[in-house]
Regions:
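Short, charged/polar connector segments at secondary-structure boundaries
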Residues: 1-135
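Amphipathic, charge-rich alpha-helical segments that serve as recognition/docking helices
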Residues: 81-82, 129, 134-219
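Exposed alpha-helical structural elements
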Residues: 73-77, 92, 154-155, 239-242, ...
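Short active-site loop/helix that positions an aromatic residue
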Residues: 119-135, 265-270, 283-290
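Extended, amphipathic alpha-helical scaffolds
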Residues: 278-344
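Tandem CBS (Cystathionine beta-synthase) repeat/Bateman regulatory domains
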Residues: 23, 170, 180-181, 186, ...
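Amphipathic alpha-helical "recognition" segments
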Residues: 132-137, 176, 201-273
Length: 344
């Protein structure tokens, strides 16, 4: 089905008098806005805002991709992710739409995939269910396909969701996961292309890439390769920044690996207080080669215990991470050893 070819004839889309300006491949152009019946649209499963929710669903269901041949079943799944990812923002957006209607037009592809406006679409679905009245989503329709225009679509999505039209920011972890997927894993975009799309500097994005790689390494360390949802509740973005800063100053690769393993172990256990401040104290140790050597020697037995506990787990979950983190022997070992290193 092509919305532009079938929609006007079959009367499930209607052209409005409104237009929306988009910049695609450096060309700025005003595009017509249409009112599209909700049942002809489907969510974008490549939306970075829900990337960790997608990875969790795939892991739990042992699948590589969510099947969207049954559009309504697929939409119900993603609807839940969008709602749970930021329920407060959802409530505010829905109240606003109910009061004054949809103000900002979204962007969809000709096959019905939503590129911009997933939250607004979700709110309209809720309103339709609540009022039992057919609702329409207002959006530009681009005659593009995800198969043949993937890079252009991703750059447009980033520009709309991170740039001028952004209303609610990404969670920091979702942003890192998106960067890892788009730049490191699939190599869909270069650092320069990503930076341009979100109006940021290449230097900042390069640092984000390194943090994203460290996040992926952390998941490998806990035997949960690419299970990014496990990092959602650990609040690792700022601690990863501190770890990246430490590693830049160390030349010896073996020392780098030992430090990463020690810090990754403490990401799980959170021995005391705020994790970012705690990691900064480790950074103070790392600034002195002698103190760092002593610290890593102290940490080794406890790191090995963490690894042993991880090896005993068949499938890692948030609950299992919590249980390992609360292991009395491990937690006390870290809390005793690290303050000793601070005072040397």
């Amino acid at each position: 089905m092509n919305l532009l070819e079938n929609g006007l004839v079959e009367k499930f889309i209607f052209k409005t008098e409104n237009k929306k300006r988009l910049v695609i491949e450096n060309i700025s152009k005003d595009y017509p806005v249409y009112r599209i019946r909700l049942d002809k649209l489907f969510y974008n499963d490549q939306n970075d805002r829900i990337s960790t929710w997608i990875s969790e669903y795939k892991m739990k269901n042992n699948i590589d991709k969510i099947d969207y041949s049954d559009r309504e079943s697929y939409n119900k799944i993603i609807h839940g992710f969008i709602t749970n990812s930021n329920s407060d923002a959802m409530k505010k957006t829905q109240q606003n739409i109910e009061a004054i209607g949809q103000i900002e037009a979204g962007v969809v592809l000709a096959d019905g995939r939503i590129i911009d406006g997933n939250r607004r679409f979700t709110c309209l679905r809720n309103i339709q269910e609540k009022n039992k009245e057919v609702q329409y989503f207002e959006a530009v329709i681009l005659d593009y396909s995800i198969e043949h225009n993937e890079k252009q679509i991703k750059m447009l999505e980033l520009m709309l969701q991170h740039g001028v039209d952004e209303k609610v920011g990404y969670s920091p972890i979702e942003r890192l996961v998106g960067i890892y997927h788009d730049i490191v894993e699939t190599k869909l975009l270069t650092i320069a292309e990503y930076a341009k799309s979100i109006n940021d500097t290449e230097k900042n994005i390069a640092m984000e890439v390194e943090k994203a790689k460290l996040l992926a390494e952390f998941l490998e360390f806990i035997n949960a390769d690419k299970q990014f949802h496990l990092a959602r509740h650990l609040e690792l973005v700022d601690p990863l920044k501190e770890l990246y800063s430490m590693l830049k100053k160390i030349n010896d690769e073996e020392t780098k690996d030992d430090l990463k393993n020690a810090v990754f172990s403490q990401f799980i256990c959170k021995p005391t207080g705020d994790l970012t401040r705690y990691t900064r104290k480790i950074k103070d140790i790392a600034n002195n080669p002698k103190h760092l050597k002593d610290y890593l020697e102290e940490q080794l037995p406890i790191v090995e215990k963490v690894c042993d506990n991880l090896e005993e787990v068949d499938q890692l979950t948030d609950k299992k991470i919590g249980e390992i983190g609360e292991n009395k022997e491990i937690k006390e070992g870290f809390s005793v050893l690290t303050p000793k290193s601070w005072t040397n």
